[in-house]
Structures are given as structure tokens and as C-alpha cells.
């Protein structure tokens, strides 16, 4: 059903694919031949931007991929990191670490508590903060018990 492929590889034009596979140069899906086989085609090359913006996923599937059709779509991955970041962080590892760090930093800045025991006006309370606080307290209690046990065993 799906073939993995790199985004940098050449992808044929929609008209070329239809003319090669069906002999039809019209890429319209409204023709009577609904058993077209598109091998190695990307969905974004097949579906128009207008339809992507206007239709939901079920409508897109029924319009472009009828149940009686046979389609082989390619799976592709595109690098969405800006060129400036690629220049600073050339390896994939460094880029992933940067993305992870900045997302955690954004979360901390969004959900942090201010220094004076009241919440700042711009801080959005996290719905999980109470759960995290309870778990942190339980973990601290368990660690305290382990340290007490360690002291008892060390003195014995």
C-alpha cells in the first residue's frame, strides 16, 4: 500500500502519471474509469489545495480514493526545520535536541509559577500540575524512606 521514499527524490507530474498508467491525460477523478492504479504517487500531488482547505478527511478520501480503486501512495518525509537552524545545527541529533529543549522551555515559561507565591497574570495554569506535584511529593517520600533505610542498615 505505502512505499517509503525521501522528499528529495523526483516525483512525476500528475498528468504524466495518469497518461502512463491509464492512457488518460486528464487528471480529473470524475471519469468513468475509477480503477486507476497510481504507483508511487504522493497524496499532495493528487489532491488540490482548494479541496484540502475545504473538505474534511472523509470527504477527501471518498472523492480521491474511491473504495473500488487501487492506489499505491508513497510515504514521504519533509524536513521542516528552517535553513538558519540547519546552518547552526547540522546534524539531525542536534536539531532534535534543539526542538525538544525549546518545546520544554516553552512549556515551562507558559506554566511556571511566579516567585511570589501568587500566579502571574500571564501564566496559564497547567491542568496536570496538581497531579505532577502529588507524584513529586510521593517520590520524595519514597526516597526519604530509602535514605532512612540506608542509614539504618549502614549503622547496623
Swiss-Prot record:
<comment type="similarity">
    <text>Belongs to the herpesviridae TRM2 protein family.</text>
</comment>
<dbReference type="GO" id="GO:0019073">
    <property type="term" value="P:viral DNA genome packaging"/>
</dbReference>
<keyword id="KW-0231">Viral genome packaging</keyword>
<keyword id="KW-1188">Viral release from host cell</keyword>
<comment type="function">
    <text>Component of the molecular motor that translocates viral genomic DNA in empty capsid during DNA packaging. Forms a tripartite terminase complex together with TRM1 and TRM3 in the host cytoplasm. Once the complex reaches the host nucleus, it interacts with the capsid portal vertex. This portal forms a ring in which genomic DNA is translocated into the capsid.</text>
</comment>
<feature type="compositionally biased region" description="Polar residues">
    <location>
        <begin position="19"/>
        <end position="37"/>
    </location>
</feature>
<keyword id="KW-1048">Host nucleus</keyword>
<dbReference type="GO" id="GO:0042025">
    <property type="term" value="C:host cell nucleus"/>
</dbReference>
<dbReference type="InterPro" id="IPR005208">
    <property type="entry name" value="Herpes_TT2"/>
</dbReference>
<feature type="region of interest" description="Disordered">
    <location>
        <begin position="1"/>
        <end position="37"/>
    </location>
</feature>
<dbReference type="Pfam" id="PF03581">
    <property type="entry name" value="Herpes_UL33"/>
</dbReference>
<protein>
    <recommendedName>
        <fullName>Tripartite terminase subunit 2</fullName>
    </recommendedName>
</protein>
<comment type="subunit">
    <text>Associates with TRM1 and TRM3 to form the tripartite terminase complex.</text>
</comment>
Amino acid at each position: 500500500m505505502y512505499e517509503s521514499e525521501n522528499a528529495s527524490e523526483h516525483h512525476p507530474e500528475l498528468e504524466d502519471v495518469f497518461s502512463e498508467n491509464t492512457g488518460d491525460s486528464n487528471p480529473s477523478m470524475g471519469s468513468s474509469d475509477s480503477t486507476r492504479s497510481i504507483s508511487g504517487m504522493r497524496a499532495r500531488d493528487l489532491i488540490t489545495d482548494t479541496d484540502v482547505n475545504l473538505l474534511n478527511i472523509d470527504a477527501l478520501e471518498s472523492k480521491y480514493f474511491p473504495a473500488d480503486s487501487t492506489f499505491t501512495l508513497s510515504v514521504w518525509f519533509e524536513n521542516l526545520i528552517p535553513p538558519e537552524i540547519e546552518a547552526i545545527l547540522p546534524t539531525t541529533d542536534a536539531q532534535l535536541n534543539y526542538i525538544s529543549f525549546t518545546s520544554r522551555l516553552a512549556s515551562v515559561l507558559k506554566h511556571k509559577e511566579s516567585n511570589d507565591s501568587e500566579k502571574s497574570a500571564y501564566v496559564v495554569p497547567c491542568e496536570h500540575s496538581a497531579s505532577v506535584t502529588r507524584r513529586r511529593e510521593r517520590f520524595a517520600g519514597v526516597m526519604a524512606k530509602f535514605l532512612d533505610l540506608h542509614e539504618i542498615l549502614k549503622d547496623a
